[in-house]
């Protein structure tokens, strides 16, 4: 996978050679290493459960519709008029187009496989780093595909977990992502009308963790080294993150600031070797979102003579459709060819990097040692919050007793 990520193939555009990353989309899902059992399997009942929270992605084309339906029904993510009726209509209408995109990257999302690889590496390290809370077991809790967050909680309860850690896999907090996953945990218990058997705490954000920053910097430097030597210092690094509607930002969502903090630390680690910008991708609909947009930035740089670029997915830790299709195909191939880019590459996602598993283990170990329920930031609602469930969720977690 790493070797394939470093290779490039030329495209000829207007007499110029356009170099784009060569990553075989058709083999992406299969490229994730399988989760292997430990040499000496753990036979004791797990004591500490780490619930790895993320949105997930459809593994098969047949899963796309249900994925979209759950997504458009999520009122923590978006509010639509007559949502229960409109969401099924939108999901049905968009399914063929999204299925086509997934077919271009191998027929499904590899995010579950990469999460399993990361979780496996994390718990192996944790058992030696924190023997007093061992054995540790990771669980995957997705919002929009199986295993759903609620299904993971049931498995944790059935396993007799004593200490449960809700660990967001979004380094930067947003009410639309991490907040939605935490609300799902609260709703699970509220709907059943029972108190948790497990003692819950949360790792709700980690935008500047040193090992996370080191991983990003290492992946960026690897790609920079593959640009022509005479172009290398002029390469513009475009840190691309999923955008957010300005209506959410204006309520006080901390996501833009936390993404910016990650970018700043990464550039400090790189000694500010190159010019850079933070840009935003995946805007949907006509309403205002964060700007500048990734695609518009690529066009604008080309028009101004800056034609060597490195795309960095800074808010994603695993490959999924927004890296493999939107960045790799829509931007690094189609758009770059149209607007005359000379060299464009994409930094590999963190995926199976052993240092990233170490980062996850360090985050959990430090969290356990802190004996804190959550970060101070989580206790503060957005100043103009309009979602009462957020306040109920925060109260649910802050009232936990470790």
UniProtKB/Swiss-Prot annotation:
Binds 1 [2Fe-2S] cluster. Pathway: Porphyrin-containing compound metabolism; protoheme biosynthesis; protoheme from protoporphyrin-IX: step 1/1. It catalyses: heme b + 2 H(+) = protoporphyrin IX + Fe(2+). PROSITE patterns: FERROCHELATASE (PS00534). Its cofactor is [2Fe-2S] cluster. Catalyzes the ferrous insertion into protoporphyrin IX. HAMAP family: Ferrochelatase (MF_00323). This is Ferrochelatase, mitochondrial. The lineage of its organism: Eukaryota, Metazoa, Chordata, Craniata, Vertebrata. The gene is FECH.
């Amino acid at each position: 996978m790493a070797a394939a990520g470093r290779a490039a193939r030329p495209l000829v555009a207007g007499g110029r050679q356009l170099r784009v990353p060569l990553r075989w989309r058709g083999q992406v899902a299969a490229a994730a290493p399988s989760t292997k059992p430990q040499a000496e399997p753990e036979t004791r009942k797990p004591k500490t459960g780490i619930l790895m929270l993320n949105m997930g992605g459809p593994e098969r084309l047949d899963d796309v519709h249900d994925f979209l339906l759950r997504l458009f029904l999520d009122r923590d993510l978006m509010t639509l008029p007559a949502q229960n009726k409109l969401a099924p209509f939108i999901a049905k209408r968009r399914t063929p187009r999204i299925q086509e995109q997934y077919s271009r990257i191998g027929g499904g999302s590899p995010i579950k496989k990469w999460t399993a690889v990361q979780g496996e590496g994390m718990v192996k390290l944790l058992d030696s780093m924190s023997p007093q809370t061992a054995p540790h077991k990771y669980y995957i809790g997705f919002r929009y595909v199986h295993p759903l967050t609620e299904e993971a909680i049931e498995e944790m309860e059935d396993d007799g977990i004593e200490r449960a850690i809700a660990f967001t896999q979004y380094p930067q907090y947003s009410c639309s992502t991490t907040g939605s996953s935490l609300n799902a945990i609260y709703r699970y218990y509220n709907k059943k009308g029972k108190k948790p058997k497990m003692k819950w705490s949360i790792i709700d954000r980690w935008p500047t963790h040193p090992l996370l920053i080191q991983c990003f910097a290492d992946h960026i430097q690897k790609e920079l080294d593959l640009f022509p030597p005479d172009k290398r210092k002029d390469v513009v690094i475009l840190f691309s993150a999923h955008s957010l509607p300005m209506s959410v930002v204006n309520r006080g969502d901390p996501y833009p600031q936390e993404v910016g903090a990650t970018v700043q630390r990464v550039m400090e680690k790189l000694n500010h070797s190159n010019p850079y910008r933070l840009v935003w991708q995946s805007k949907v609909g006509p309403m205002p979102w964060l700007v500048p947009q990734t695609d518009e930035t690529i066009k604008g740089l080309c028009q101004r003579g800056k034609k060597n670029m490195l795309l960095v997915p800074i808010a994603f830790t695993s490959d999924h459709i927004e890296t493999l299709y939107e960045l790799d195909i829509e931007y690094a191939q189609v758009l770059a060819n149209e607007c005359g880019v000379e060299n464009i590459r994409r930094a590999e996602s963190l995926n199976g990097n052993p240092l990233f598993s170490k980062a996850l283990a360090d985050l959990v170990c430090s969290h356990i040692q802190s004996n804190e329920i959550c970060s101070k930031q989580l206790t503060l609602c957005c100043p103009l919050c309009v979602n009462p469930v957020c306040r109920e969720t925060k109260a649910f977690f802050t009232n936990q007793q470790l």
